[in-house]
């Protein structure tokens, strides 16, 4: 016992071992990915520094990855939705052709006005035409914002068609110099409308690719791509203007080709955009696919089925539904009370005609309400072909069938990534009791 006490005393008398604090040790580690080794270290101020230790990548791979880092969102391709690469490729071609065409039209404008392209004179022309007629076009087009929310793809295409129309008027202005002011003014009026439509539709298009809350990154990299190919297009336009397009005939031929390439590029861009909001056309396509196959398509699956030029055209397999007519025009006054009794808890009314079915929505109806109404209309359409029952019985049977399938149908819709909290029907008229 005495021996143990002496041993404990000896241990207590020994100097304690002094351990270094964590701050005395440099915190660093190495990460290797795709033949590149990086050394990461926390500095004394808490910031993380990175240094390339070894890079065994071949030069072409380094160049490609450097380009991707500068012009594509971080984490690409896993940080964006399907279709982004196709969209970006044709966006680059669109901006290249547009910039080249713009150079040719500017040259024609200056020539038609009898001006030399000096900075002072060019500024005067820009102020009179662009800051005048172009602003008028912007004001008129700004009233169509709700329609652009509903059909951003269609309006994006229309924006580029308007832009090419305006550029075309500028391009041919030297052929009729006595109408210079009228043609140049109309050209810039069309360009003003195109500018508003293009900018207004940019956000919903970019939003469709955001997968990890990275909308700002996608927007910034998209604008970087646009700037890069705009500069390249301006360079190509300057070269064309001094060679092939030095004559009016050359301008007309090359300008027509560039315009076709420009519009084709934007159409292909829009085919690659997987927008996940519900509008009349996408809702009808979802219902039609569900009734045919029992499955709901995802936004990437549905994008190639959309009619980009005539989206308001009714789809027969989904009940030939049209949305947006005023209640007093779509439904006979004598029918309103009867329809209210059928759809007593719903936020829509359906009026079946010979050629199509009108659906009128309440002011606070959502995408779910539109889906319910579309299903009823589609079931009525299919039952009418099979049964000879009175319209009231068919309508009630279709409504009951919709209620039976709606919950699993809605679960599929939401699981596929569709946003059902809103229904974008453009400037469609709604009602309130």
From Swiss-Prot:
Biological processes, Gene Ontology terms: auxin polar transport; response to UV-B
Keyword terms of this UniProt record: Plastid
Plastid as UniProt keyword: yes
Mutagenesis / variant outcome for changing residue 105 to L: In wxr1; reduced auxin transport from the shoot to the root
Organism superkingdom: Eukaryota
Disulfide bonds: none
Tissue: Expressed throughout the plant, with a higher expression near the root apical meristem, in the cortex region of the root elongation zone, in lateral roots and emerging lateral roots. Not detected in extreme root apical meristem or root cap.
InterPro entries: RUS_fam, UVB_sens_C, UVB_sens_RUS_dom
Annotated knockout phenotype: No visible phenotype under normal growth conditions. Extremely stunted growth, failure to develop true postembryonic leaves and arrested primary root elongation, when grown in vitro.
Compartments (UniProt record): Plastid
GO cellular component: chloroplast envelope; plastid
Assembly and interaction partners: Interacts (via the DUF647 domain) with RUS1 (via the DUF647 domain).
Miscellaneous remark of the record: Several mutations in ASP2 (AC P46645), but not all, and any of the non-phosphorylated B6 vitamers can suppress the rus phenotype.
Function description: Involved in a root UV-B sensing pathway and in the protection against the hypersensitivity to very low-fluence-rate (VLF) UV-B. RSU1 and RUS2 are probably both negative modulators of the same UV-B perception pathway, which when overstimulated in the roots causes a block to postgermination development. Required for polar auxin transport and to maintain the normal levels of PIN proteins in the root.
Protein family: Belongs to the RUS1 family.
Protein name, entry field: Protein root UVB sensitive 2, chloroplastic
Protein source organism: Arabidopsis thaliana
């Amino acid at each position: 016992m005495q021996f143990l006490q002496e041993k404990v005393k000896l241990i207590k008398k020994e100097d304690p071992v002094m351990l270094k604090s964590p701050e005395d040790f440099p915190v660093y580690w190495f990460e290797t990915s795709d033949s590149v080794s990086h050394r990461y270290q926390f500095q004394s101020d808490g910031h993380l520094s990175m240094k390339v230790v070894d890079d065994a990548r071949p030069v072409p791979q380094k160049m490609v990855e450097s380009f991707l880092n500068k012009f594509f969102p971080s984490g690409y391709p896993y940080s964006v939705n399907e279709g982004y690469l196709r969209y970006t490729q044709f966006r680059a071609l669109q901006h290249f052709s547009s910039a080249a065409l713009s150079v040719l039209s500017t040259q024609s404008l200056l020539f038609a006005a009898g001006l030399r392209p000096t900075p002072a004179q060019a500024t005067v022309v820009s102020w009179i035409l662009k800051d005048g007629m172009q602003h008028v076009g912007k004001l008129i087009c700004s009233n169509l914002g709700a329609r652009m929310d509903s059909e951003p793809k269609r309006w994006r295409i229309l924006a580029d068609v308007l832009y090419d129309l305006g550029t075309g008027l500028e391009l041919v202005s030297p052929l009729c110099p006595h109408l210079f002011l009228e043609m140049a003014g109309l050209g810039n009026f069309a360009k003003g409308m195109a500018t508003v439509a293009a900018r207004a539709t940019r956000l919903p298009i970019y939003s469709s690719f955001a997968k990890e809350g990275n909308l700002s990154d996608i927007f910034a990299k998209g604008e970087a791509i646009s700037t890069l190919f705009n500069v390249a297009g301006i360079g190509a336009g300057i070269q064309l203007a001094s060679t092939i397009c030095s004559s009016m005939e050359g301008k007309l031929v090359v300008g027509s080709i560039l315009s076709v390439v420009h519009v084709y590029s934007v159409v292909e861009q829009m085919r690659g955009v997987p927008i996940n909001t519900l509008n009349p056309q996408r809702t009808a396509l979802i219902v039609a696919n569900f009734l045919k196959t029992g499955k709901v398509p995802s936004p990437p699956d549905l994008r190639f089925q959309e009619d980009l030029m005539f989206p308001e055209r009714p789809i027969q397999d989904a009940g030939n539904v049209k949305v947006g007519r005023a209640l007093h025009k779509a439904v006979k006054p004598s029918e309103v009370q009867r329809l209210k009794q059928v759809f007593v808890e719903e936020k829509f009314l359906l009026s079946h005609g010979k050629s199509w079915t009108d659906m009128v929505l309440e002011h606070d109806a959502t995408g779910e309400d539109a889906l319910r109404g579309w299903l009823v209309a589609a079931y009525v359409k299919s039952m009418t072909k099979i049964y000879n029952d009175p319209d009231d019985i068919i309508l009630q049977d279709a409504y009951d069938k919709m209620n039976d399938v709606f919950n699993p149908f809605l679960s599929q819709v939401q699981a596929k990534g569709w946003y059902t909290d809103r229904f974008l029907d453009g400037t469609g008229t709604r009602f309130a009791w």
